[in-house]
Amino acid sequence: ADVSRLIEAAGWPVTLVGSSLGGHYANHLAEKYGLNAVLINPAAVRYLDPALFIGDHVNFHSGERFTFTVAHAVQLAAQVSPPTPGRYWLLSEMGDEVLDWRQAAEFYAGCRQTVLPGGDHSFTRFAEFMPQILEYAGL
C-alpha cells in the first residue's frame, strides 16, 4: 500500500526495480500502473509451490522474524499478472541457488532479457549493470 501511494503521488514516470520476491511485486505493480520494471533474479510465483514457504522465517538483512501463512500464499497467487513484454527487463544469473532462472526466462518470454552464466541469487553483477539500469529508467 505504501509503494502504491508513492507511485500515485509521483509527478514523473516511475520505473520499478525488484529482486527475488520483490521482482514479483514489481511485476504486479508495473501491470497495475502501466510502468516499466527491471526484474533481478525474480520469483516467478506462477511456478512456485507457496505451500513450501508456509511457516516461520527470518529476514536475511534485518533478522526480523515473520510467519508466512496460507493467506499470504493466496494473496501472492492472486497477484500473478502476465507481463506486457515492452515493459520489462529481466536480469538473471544462471547460478541462482534459490530460484530457477529458467522459470523467470519462460514467464518473461518476449521481454528484454539478460541471462548470464554463473553468479548467485544476490545477482553478483549488480554494480556492473547499475549504469544500464539507470539508463533504462531514464535517469
Language model features: what each stretch is:
Residues 11-12, 85:
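Active-site acidic short loop of glycosyltransferases
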Residues 1-10:
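Active-site catalytic motif of lipid deacylating hydrolases and related acyltransferases
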Residues 29-33:
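Aromatic pocket-lining residues of Rossmann-like dinucleotide-binding sites
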